[in-house]
Each structure stands twice: as structure tokens, then as C-alpha cells.
From Swiss-Prot:
The lineage of its organism: Eukaryota, Discoba, Euglenozoa, Kinetoplastea, Metakinetoplastina. The active site is a redox-active disulfide bond. It is found in: Cytoplasm. Its main location: cytoplasm. Binds 1 FAD per subunit. The gene is TPR. Belongs to the class-I pyridine nucleotide-disulfide oxidoreductase family. Keywords: Cytoplasm, Disulfide bond, FAD, Flavoprotein, NADP, Oxidoreductase, Redox-active center. Its EC number is 1.8.1.12. This is Trypanothione reductase. Trypanothione is the parasite analog of glutathione; this enzyme is the equivalent of glutathione reductase.
Length: 492
């Protein structure tokens, strides 16, 4: 016999939990949330809290924080700190254990939320669509496996997130994804991270800090410059600093196959014919919407050409009572975006307050070493959308690095504006503190701040952030898509 709910949510990630909690607490609806695992780790990895909590933002940020201490220890000598000769070494096992405990605490807090919230129920298993109003919960992902529960609902929300993409090459079974990287029993001595995106760059920094003596971190990317889609100046500077930190970056290289050596290490053959022997190959070539186990075909839910669930601006699918939010829609794969989408959906469906998520001017960060903060348009995109664009840029050595021994660690700040009216279209930062600074910048962009608002604001001294309040003269311009040092008088 079916259990009846107002809302059934498949997926207990950030967006699904936000939607379920809000529906139950704000609008007193009866809500069911389904997921395959309560606590983090193998075999399914994404448990209560979703990718972010279990195999994404949270554990990654903890591990990056740990990795930064390598430089802090080295740089402390410039500030008068001396060590008596006793060894300092990284303890990977201790890091992973501490990370696991922190993530488990969050898992348990969500368990408590379900136990303590009236009208909010959790079901363990694999949720899939039987009809447009019925969700079945099965023992496994196999659609022929035993049915544990049958849930009837007026509204169904798909929020199963995304999954690491693995390439179709021989020997891919010898490689890991970022999921497994969070649970490696030992730090790899020789590691190859494949991909030029933020996940590959972030893990390269983590592995580089914790590698055993004599270790080597290599990052390969199929194109000529990592971090496609980010500001080009920052991409170039990140490459310089990663290289200065000892990471080898192989551009225009892509693995063709991976085989095992007799000692268990991996032999990577690239499309160019080059080879590399490493202990771990981590694939980080992107993430794909996790739709394959939902049985969407049973009700005809449409997908986008890239495999995401097709939705409108209110997160509605083509089936009237079925919705989708978060990574599964392949709109903007960021945790705060999924949370906002979940809250907006519940307000729309149950609160009679139609609301949609604004996917523009969303601040985000890359927790690489050095870190990146970005919000709004990069200059190439702005130049296509606006006739006249002015770019303000500054690159400098932060005060601390004048004595830290790391003068190569430049801070880069760039402001992209519509030169016709001064509106700030994008801000891009590289260096210590960039992720923290960019959050406040995001508020400015949402308020349609102008460049004059920035330079007329008194900065906090001495900080890197004050540079945003110091740039009064454009570094260069774009006119009808063409880059130039100065604008012709006729266009002024």
C-alpha cells in the first residue's frame, strides 16, 4: 500500500534537503526524502548532504586548508620563526581521519533533523519514478530489485546531483575519480590528475603538499591553458604559481590508455605517444547529471542535449508535477545555487510566491593554491555582449610576501566594466583571501555597482582587497569586440 505525501524528494543533497525542510517547516507539508546512504564513504559516497558534504566542497576545503600549512611553515622563517631541527612531516592518515569525523558530524546532524522535524521523513534506498505521482524505493539501483516502499505524491522533486565523468579509454578501471581520492589510505608518491578544471587543480595542490619525499605531482590537460572559462590573466598566473610550487603541468596532452606495471603502478600512454609512470591516476574531466537510475522514461521527463533534466526558469520539467533542481539540471553546478533553487521552488509550489533563481552574477571560488574568486562576466564574454568594455587590472606582491620568501605569489585583481555607463560586469581575483573577498563583491554586482562606487570607497589598509578601491584608470578596452590600449576619440 502506498504512503501518501505532498512532496517526495529523490536525493538528500543540499538542494533536496533545503526543499524538503522548507516544505515541512514553513508550509507544514508532509515530505519524504530518499537517498541511498546516510553516512559518507564507500560504496556510494554521496550520502546525507550530497556531493558537497561528502565528496565535494566540505572535505575538499578541509584538505586544502591542511595543504596550505606546508607553505606557512616554510614562509614562517622570514618572520623570525626558527625550528630546532626536529623533523616536521605530513600525516595523511591523521588528515583523512579528522576529515572523516567532521563529515560524519554533518551526516549525523541531518539524521537528527529528520528525527526532530514533524512531517519530514527519510527513506533509505534507490528512488525512481513508477508514474508521474508514484515513486518506488528499491533495495538497489536495479529496476528489477525488491521494492521497499511505494510513495504517492502530489509533487515530485528530482535532486540527485551529479557524478564524476570517466573517459572511455582502455584501462580506465585502473584510475580513480575525486570520490575515491578523498579516501586514499596513503598519499600518492607519484600522481597524475587528468583535466584542467577546478577539481583537478585543487587536488593537485593537496597532493603536492602531502606527497612523500621524492614525490611528484603532474597535471595534464588536453588544451593549452588550464581552467577554461575563467579569466585568462588569472589562468596564466595560476599556471606560473603551480609550476613554481613544483607541480608539472602537461598541456595539449590527453591519456589514450592506462595499464598496470608489475609493481602495481600505472603506465599512462598519452595520445601524443608520450608515457608516464605514476602510482595514482585521478580523472577529473568533469561531472555529469546523475539521471541514469531514475527511470525518467516511465513518465517521459525530457533531458537536455548534455544529459541534464530539462527545466524552465521555475525548475519545472515538462511533466507538470515533477521538478528538478541542482546539478541534475546542469545549469550551474554550485551548492549555494542548488539551495537557492530548492527554496525558490518550495515558495513557488506551496507558498503561492512564484520565485526563480537568478543564475547570473553568482560569486564562486576555486580553492587552488593560490585560490581564485570570481563573479560575473570575463572580459571576452563582456566584449561580445557590450559595445564598449573597460578593463581595470592590477598585479602586485602582497605585503607579507616581501619577507616570506615567496615573492612569486602575485595577487591579481581585475574589474570588467561596461564603459558606456561604468557598470561593473565582472570581478576576478587570484591570491590569498580571494574566495572571502569575492563574496562581498557579489553583493555589489547584484546592486549594479559602478566602477566609481568601487574607487570612491575608502579601502582597508594594508590589505589585498583595497586594490579594488584603488583602480581608477582602465588598463585597456574593447570596442565592438576588438581589444585596444586606448579608445579612438570618435568613440569617447
Amino acid at each position: 500500500m502506498s504512503k501518501i505525501f505532498d512532496l517526495v524528494v529523490i536525493g538528500a543533497g543540499s538542494g533536496g534537503l533545503e526543499a524538503g525542510w522548507n516544505a515541512a517547516t514553513l508550509y507544514k507539508k508532509r515530505v519524504a526524502v530518499i537517498d541511498v546512504q546516510t553516512h559518507h564513504g564507500p560504496p556510494h559516497y554521496a550520502a546525507l548532504g550530497g556531493t558537497c558534504v561528502n565528496v565535494g566542497c566540505v572535505p575538499k576545503k578541509l584538505m586544502v586548508t591542511g595543504a596550505q600549512y606546508m607553505d606557512h611553515l616554510r614562509e614562517s622563517a622570514g618572520f623570525g620563526w626558527e625550528f630546532d631541527g626536529s623533523s616536521v612531516k605530513a600525516n595523511w592518515k591523521k588528515l583523512i581521519a579528522a576529515k572523516n569525523e567532521a563529515v560524519l558530524d554533518i551526516n549525523k546532524s541531518y539524521e537528527g533533523m529528520f528525527n526532530d522535524t514533524e512531517g519530514l521523513d527519510f527513506f533509505l534506498g534507490w528512488g525512481s519514478l513508477e508514474s508521474k505521482n508514484v515513486v518506488v524505493v528499491r533495495e538497489t539501483a536495479d529496476p528489477k530489485s525488491a521494492v521497499k516502499e511505494r510513495l504517492q505524491a502530489d509533487h515530485i522533486l528530482l535532486a540527485t546531483g551529479s557524478w564524476p565523468q570517466m573517459p572511455a579509454i582502455p584501462g580506465v578501471e585502473h584510475c580513480i575519480s575525486s570520490n575515491e581520492a578523498f579516501y586514499l589510505p596513503e598519499p600518492p608518491r607519484r600522481v597524475l590528475t587528468v583535466g584542467g578544471g577546478f577539481i583537478s587543480v585543487e587536488f593537485a595542490g593537496i597532493f603536492n603538499a602531502y606527497k612523500p619525499p621524492g614525490g611528484k605531482v603532474t597535471l595534464c590537460y588536453r588544451n593549452n591553458l588550464i581552467l577554461r572559462g575563467f579569466d585568462e590573466t588569472i589562468r596564466e598566473e595560476v599556471t606560473k604559481q603551480l609550476t613554481a610550487n613544483g607541480i608539472e603541468i602537461m598541456t595539449n596532452e590527453n591519456p589514450a590508455k592506462v595499464s598496470l606495471n608489475t609493481d602495481g603502478s600505472k603506465h599512462v600512454t598519452f595520445e601524443s605517444g608520450k608515457t608516464l609512470d605514476v602510482d595514482v591516476v585521478m580523472m577529473a574531466i568533469g561531472r555529469i547529471p546523475r539521471t541514469n537510475d531514475l527511470q525518467l522514461g516511465n513518465v517521459g521527463v525530457k533531458l537536455t542535449p548534455k544529459g541534464g533534466v530539462q527545466v524552465d526558469e521555475f525548475s519545472r520539467t515538462n511533466v507538470p508535477n515533477i521538478y528538478a533542481i541542482g546539478d541534475i539540471t546542469d545549469r550551474l553546478m554550485l551548492t549555494p545555487v542548488a539551495i537557492n533553487e530548492g527554496a525558490a521552488l518550495v515558495d513557488t509550489v506551496f507558498g503561492n510566491k512564484p520565485r526563480k533563481t537568478d543564475h547570473t552574477r553568482v560569486a564562486s571560488a576555486v580553492f587552488s593554491i593560490p585560490p581564485i574568486g570570481t563573479c560575473g562576466l570575463i572580459e571576452e564574454v563582456a566584449a561580445k555582449e557590450f559595445e564598449k568594455v573597460a578593463v581595470y587590472m592590477s598585479s602586485f606582491t602582497p605585503l607579507m610576501h616581501n619577507i616570506s620568501g615567496s615573492k612569486y605569489k602575485k595577487f591579481v585583481a581585475k574589474i570588467v566594466t561596461n564603459h558606456s555607463d561604468g557598470t561593473v560586469l565582472g570581478v576576478h581575483l587570484l591570491g590569498d583571501g580571494a574566495p572571502e573577498i569575492i563574496q562581498a563583491v557579489g553583493v555589489c554586482l547584484r546592486l549594479n555597482a559602478k566602477i566609481s562606487d568601487f574607487y570612491n570607497t575608502i579601502g582597508v589598509h594594508p590589505t589585498s582587497a583595497e586594490e579594488l578601491c584603488s583602480m581608477r584608470t582602465p588598463s585597456y578596452y574593447y570596442l565592438k569586440g576588438e581589444k585596444m590600449e586606448t579608445l579612438p576619440e570618435s568613440s569617447l
